[in-house]
Design a protein with these regions (language model features):
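Extreme N-terminal, non-catalytic leader segments
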Residues: 1-20
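Conserved glycine(s) of the Walker
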Residues: 31-32
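Glycine-rich, often acidic-flanked micro-motifs
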Residues: 14-27, 42-189
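Post-Walker A alpha-helix
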Residues: 36-37
């Protein structure tokens, strides 16, 4: 294990990998981030971390295995991607969140313990939104992800974080069609 001095930051995001290419999905609660993670897992991506994505001083994102919480509105698409989804126990969270099921990381895909992530997507799902991925200015992207991130105040970690930002491409991603957005992501990675 690593001790606190080895962690540069923790993001509020989901990190996934496919064929040694790694992406992170960020977005507000209810933005479709967990749904897109589930869709990508059903399309040969390995889940590295969901909702809590730690990055070490070496710039690698580490496996933080936890189940993805799937809201009731996404049960039908999730059950098409994962045969045993219907058998998962349902939990009532609150009046606002409603019922959820917890989908564990898919063991048919390769388990990735740590990897370098150089593409970050700010996700937004909406039935009236177009399927679009566009590169965005790093400053604008950081304004979205930093409020929910923890960054070490150690100067070496801060420098490593800045270097990671310089090497990383940030995107805004909107979608309404699962198959189309998977194809678009696969082209970018």
């Amino acid at each position: 294990g690593k001790d606190e001095s080895e962690w540069t930051c923790v993001f509020h995001g989901s990190t996934l990998s496919k064929k040694e290419r790694t992406i992170m999905l960020t977005g507000d609660s209810g933005s479709g981030k967990s749904s897109l993670s589930t869709i990508l897992m059903g399309n040969n991506f390995s889940l590295i971390a969901d909702d809590f994505s730690p990055m070490s001083i070496s710039g690698n994102h580490y496996n933080f295995p936890s189940a993805i919480s799937i809201k009731q509105g996404f049960y039908k698409p999730a059950s098409k991607l994962f045969n045993d989804f219907v058998n998962l126990k349902q939990y009532f969270i609150s009046e606002t969140k409603g019922n959820v099921k917890y989908l564990p990381p898919d063991n048919k895909n390769e388990m990735v313990l740590n990897t370098h992530c150089d593409k970050v997507f700010s996700v937004k799902f909406g039935k009236n939104l177009s399927n679009e991925i566009k590169e965005v200015n790093k400053g604008i992207a950081l304004n979205k992800i930093l409020p929910d991130a923890w960054i070490s105040n150690n100067m070496e970690h801060v420098k490593n974080f800045i270097n990671w930002v310089k090497e990383t491409t940030f995107y805004d991603l909107t979608y309404n069609d699962n198959e189309k957005i998977v194809k678009m992501i696969n082209k970018i990675i």
